[in-house]
Amino acid sequence: MVTTVDSVSERGTVREVLAGANNAALRELSDFVARWGCSSVSPFHAEPGLTMVDLCGRGVVGYAAIRKWAVLPADVVTIPGQQEEALAMLLDHLRQVGRRPVFTAVTSQQPYERAGCYTHRIADDPMIDPANFSLDGRRMSSVRHSVASARRSGLRVVPWTQALNAAITGVSEEWLRTKRGGEMGFTLGRLDHFDPATVDCRAAIDGNGHIVGFTTWRSYQNGHARVLDIMRRTVDAPNPTMDLLIADSLSTFAASGVRQVSLGSVPISHGPLGERVYPTVSLRRYKEKFAPTWQPLWLVAPSRVLFPAALRAVAHAFCPDGILSAVRRNP
């Protein structure tokens, strides 16, 4: 069953679509996001369960409806040269349907500030050029030693195949049993949303042929960019498992035409309670091992006055079961 909501202004007709994963209209908008999305967070506009918005062919977004808020993952995805026009259309549309916008992580403040919005630095994106990625040099010594140790222990990396599905699911379920609050969502991927057509999954196999960990990478920029999404391993996996998975992927991406890689944005730390919801300090330290270039991301709210309410809406999008459930993940 497909639900559409249209709004009409002097700029044209804007269409909302909320549908099942097999709906043709939704697939068309998801394809637009995959082709034109330039931000590492842009693939999450097409997450299952989000309302997708067609901005007269100029742009596409997805949003989570949280009370009166439209919580958007990232920048408006547009064809070149149409960002400000598409943004104006989106803001007009959301006013007409009675929703306030909050953009969770955008790459540039200027278009939103020109539209009268308030911006606040919320995260940093660790970017890597795969063409220049190497394990050589002092800065990469920790990863280099981990990869050597992993290979000595018999670990190897293989791409996803249907035959590995059950084992990968088993690894994920074991990992989730260590997280009492379960999976989060929104711009944090869920394995039950895994689509091999749009997600690159790689698994680590030990010397006995057992899968002990895996990563997933989302595609954007028309297939020329990747963003690290899910990282999971078994409790008894060798310590260097994840280092091997990431380093092996980074070493092979350039040969397959990938020009840009994100290790996944890391929120700015907000103190001890925030760390219990999402452990940003340790995650930032881990990703720094791969020598990325950190680029700032900004949260956009309608105004400074509405910023606290916008943050609460974003928190609800990530933790639909409530912040307390997320806190229980990391006691």
Predicted regions mapped to residue ranges:
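Hydrophobic, well-ordered secondary-structure elements that form the walls
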Residues: 287
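A conserved beta-strand-loop-helix scaffold within acyl/acetyltransferase catalytic domains
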Residues: 14-71, 75, 103-120, 125-270, ...
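Short acidic, S/G/P-rich loop/turn micro-motifs used as interaction or catalytic elements
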Residues: 76-80
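A structural motif corresponding to the C-terminal end of an alpha-helix
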Residues: 290-291
